[in-house]
A protein has these predicted regions:
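Solvent-exposed, acidic/flexible segments
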Residues: 86-97, 115-119, 133-137, 191-195
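N-terminal low-complexity, Pro/Thr/Ser-rich intrinsically disordered segments
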Residues: 33-78
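N-terminal secretory signal peptides
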Residues: 62-111
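Mature extracellular/secreted ectodomains of secretory-pathway proteins
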Residues: 101-172
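Short, low-complexity, disordered segments immediately C-terminal to signal peptides
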Residues: 8-10, 17-47
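Amphipathic alpha-helical packing elements
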Residues: 162-163, 188-220
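Stable alpha-helical elements in mature extracytoplasmic
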Residues: 96-99, 122, 136-140, 157, ...
Length: 229
């Protein structure tokens, strides 16, 4: 089964918070951020409500690989990962979101043909972490889904972003990708839409079974607990 990202990167993709309470998350519980603080998303000053933007149509024919744009997205990805793992991020997520909006307005969603698979994954990760701009995050999900339907984006990425948007709204998630840490154990950030079908749906998106994923996240949550986070 294809793995969406190395284990070290899973925290940034699906781990939404750590806590001290017993039991899993419920629909009424407030989502927590990467460091455990309350983080119910509030639109930032750079949200679509404050700065209008319009995506270009998805380009699927006659698209030439853009090395410069690929390299720019990969550099944005590296800065994102530095910020997610406690490193130096002088750019900040708002600037990356605004730049991704500009890219989408000019090119449409960055497709595999345009920027390669790693460049497309980089664009998705920036959208995945746009929690303080939920309107953009939801719009990015629509664009990413359209690209996946055209074979120009990963269905695994769609699954993660779909769950991220749902969990951010306090809604049930489909694939169980969004997780919180509770006493050193991985717990679903919000309940599942179809618990009996989750592994079937995950398989269609190219993801490992949920118990395998949770076992990996358990290791990360245990490490975070030892660090006192």
């Amino acid at each position: 089964m294809r793995r969406l990202a190395p284990l070290a990167a899973v925290v940034a993709l699906g781990l939404v918070g750590c806590g001290d309470s017993d039991g899993g998350s419920s629909e009424s519980e407030q989502q927590t951020g990467p460091t455990g603080e309350s983080s119910s998303p509030e639109p930032s000053s750079t949200s679509p409500a404050a700065s209008t933007w319009s995506p270009a149509p998805l380009a699927t024919e006659g698209v030439a690989f853009d090395q410069k744009l690929h390299d720019e997205l990969m550099a944005m990805f590296r800065r994102d990962q530095a910020g997610q793992t406690g490193g130096i991020d002088n750019e900040g997520p708002d600037a990356r979101i605004e730049r991704l909006k500009e890219i989408i307005a000019e090119h449409g969603w960055p497709t595999f043909d345009l920027v390669g698979k790693d460049g497309g994954d980089a664009a998705w990760i920036i959208a995945q972490h746009a929690d303080l701009d939920p309107d953009f995050q939801a719009a990015a999900l629509e664009l990413l889904t359209e690209a996946a339907e055209a074979g120009q984006a990963s269905w695994g990425n769609v699954a993660y972003l779909e769950d991220r948007v749902a969990a951010g709204n306090g809604e049930r998630q489909t694939y169980g990708t969004q997780i919180g840490c509770v006493r050193g154990k991985a717990k679903l950030a919000t309940p599942l839409t179809q618990p009996d079908r989750v592994d079937e749906l995950r398989a269609k998106a190219g993801l490992d079974p949920l118990d395998v994923y949770l076992a990996e996240l358990d290791k990360i949550c245990a490490r975070e607990q030892k660090r006192g986070r």
